[in-house]
């Protein structure tokens, strides 16, 4: 019996004009996820996906490239205006935001949703280099 040919699922074009950009910037990586108002993912990218490995993933340039890639994918779905939610202490926060504006998306609001503990978990010990 012949095997059935595997079908390549083609992503359908969603017509979404406004969305939310979640920029998660940690000390090691920067992830950019673009969702609609309900939280369904339209596109995403990260520094690691853009072929940055190791300590280069945490640079502002890697965050800029990841934001440009996610914005380019989202614009194919008709995205024009976004609200930005930045989370985390990483170095790629501002450069990712600038890259989104340079990619042609209109930023309507910027929120910092970094979680701040009210004396929760013990932080990692200080590095001695």
Curated annotation (Swiss-Prot):
The keyword Ligase does not apply. Keywords: Ribonucleoprotein, Ribosomal protein, RNA-binding, rRNA-binding. Pfam families: Ribosomal_S11. PANTHER family: 40S RIBOSOMAL PROTEIN S14/30S RIBOSOMAL PROTEIN S11. It comes from the Bacteria. GO terms for molecular function: rRNA binding; structural constituent of ribosome. This is Small ribosomal subunit protein uS11. Transmembrane segments: none annotated. Part of the 30S ribosomal subunit. Interacts with proteins S7 and S18. Binds to IF-3.
């Amino acid at each position: 019996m012949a095997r059935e040919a595997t079908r390549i699922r083609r992503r359908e074009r969603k017509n979404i004009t406004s969305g939310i950009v979640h920029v998660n910037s940690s000390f090691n990586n920067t992830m950019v996820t673009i969702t609609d108002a309900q939280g369904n993912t339209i596109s995403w990218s990260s520094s690691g996906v853009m072929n940055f490995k190791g300590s280069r993933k945490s640079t502002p340039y890697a965050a800029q490239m990841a934001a440009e890639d996610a914005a380019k994918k989202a614009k194919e779905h008709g995205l024009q205006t976004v609200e930005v939610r930045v989370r985390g202490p990483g170095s790629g926060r501002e450069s990712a935001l600038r890259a989104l504006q340079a990619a042609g998306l209109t930023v309507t609001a910027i929120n910092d949703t970094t979680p701040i503990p009210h004396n929760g978990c013990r932080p990692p010990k200080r590095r001695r280099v």
